């Protein structure tokens, strides 16, 4: 009987594969950390549907572990960048952004951000050179005849590999600083009058002063900030493609952009047909908790529990700050499950248990969970939205400030500043979110609209990948704006022509009037003289 069931399941999988698209070959150029965790969800689903997925893995990557992904194939290639160097860079990157970077305006943090991004760009340029100069690997990839490439544009190079292999490619991205990649390479439409620029930390309904700040941010990211060292990348891409080109032009060839966000987190703005918002694709129903954890949760009674996690990349919280947080947690009647990897705080209460790892999604989906203290990472925020849990946000770096600002604007969170918050601030925020039904009501509303979609985010992401494999491209969805120069795109040539026409008309009209005036004046003077 089991053998029959296995055969039936295999037959069903094969039939599903043929119904949607022939079982294809997908090549992946990934990014590390949460970027990899998100894209891996898509890859696992592709494997479930019968596709063959191969991941290009730089040997310097240390989070992306092939042993934890048995269904995927990996091509690990040697790199000139060491694993220790890359790890130390990312740790420094997070620490500087969390504790040193000014947050007043975009201009206040711009020099520090640009320095970090320049170093980031150099690392990935080295990784890109390592992979495309590896003739043995590139020959193997060429012979494998992949159907499509899936890439994270924050880690540039996927588009170059796709061009060299002559296959279509798609992007999976949460954001780039200031939406620079999205605007320059994707031609995204993001009016600064009502769309907050990412990394501005602004919410949806902006005041006049906030719109000024937003405009300054947009101008900075559009005209001064460089996500990648353009000259280096442009020269490198031109050399390997054998023709003059630019990084922006090459990235602009993407068939589809899969944005790891959605309208329950974002604010409405214009979008394009080759862009789909698939935020929350990793979310799923909660599973049962481990026995000892379930017993602790149940012991909370009617008060319920609070889940506390500031992510996996921050482990250097000061002892003073940890004690302030622990003291505040000890004052509430709820039981607390705290993901914390450090010295146990002296003020830790009897109601609080510290764990090095938490089944976060399963806890957020537990009926006794009352609130979620989070750093505001997109994954955690979406899990809270999925399960309808209000948040206390303590953003640390990246777009976390923006995520929490959006949740505050939507009435599902309260924000704290990790640099300035006191123990009383933490306690007041906890009591406000737990006791005020306003936050729970809005969290449930966000959860409701997240679930009320015609197609699950993960299914949409996979659909578009299979769509590109079926049709070999999706050029009919790609805006023609990609074929225009920057001045044509903004109609500056048309505006200049029309202004010149108006100016010419005005000049000719004035000259005609002057001629007529002089003619009649001369005629009148002549008549008087006679």
Swiss-Prot record:
Annotated localization: Endoplasmic reticulum membrane
Record-given protein name: UDP-glucuronosyltransferase 2B17
Species lineage: Eukaryota, Metazoa, Chordata, Craniata, Vertebrata
A cellular component annotation (GO) from this entry: endoplasmic reticulum membrane
Organism: Mus musculus
MF annotations from Gene Ontology: glucuronosyltransferase activity
Primary location recorded for the protein, binned into one broad class: endoplasmic reticulum
Keyword terms, alphabetized: Endoplasmic reticulum, Glycoprotein, Glycosyltransferase, Lipid metabolism, Membrane, Signal, Steroid metabolism, Transferase, Transmembrane, Transmembrane helix
Spans through the membrane: 494-510
Gene designation: Ugt2b17
EC assignment: 2.4.1.17
Keyword Endoplasmic reticulum on entry: yes
GO biological process: estrogen metabolic process
UniProt catalytic activity: glucuronate acceptor + UDP-alpha-D-glucuronate = acceptor beta-D-glucuronoside + UDP + H(+); 17alpha-estradiol + UDP-alpha-D-glucuronate = 17alpha-estradiol 3-O-(beta-D-glucuronate) + UDP + H(+); 17alpha-estradiol + UDP-alpha-D-glucuronate = 17alpha-estradiol 17-O-(beta-D-glucuronate) + UDP + H(+); 17beta-estradiol + UDP-alpha-D-glucuronate = 17beta-estradiol 17-O-(beta-D-glucuronate) + UDP + H(+)
Membrane topology label: Single-pass membrane protein
Function: UDP-glucuronosyltransferase (UGT) that catalyzes phase II biotransformation reactions in which lipophilic substrates are conjugated with glucuronic acid to increase the metabolite's water solubility, thereby facilitating excretion into either the urine or bile. Catalyzes the glucuronidation of endogenous steroid hormones such as androgens (epitestosterone, androsterone) and estrogens (estradiol, epiestradiol).
Family statement: Belongs to the UDP-glycosyltransferase family.
Signal peptide (UniProt feature, chain positions): 1-23
Glycosylation (residues): 316, 483
Keyword Transferase: yes
EC class name: transferase
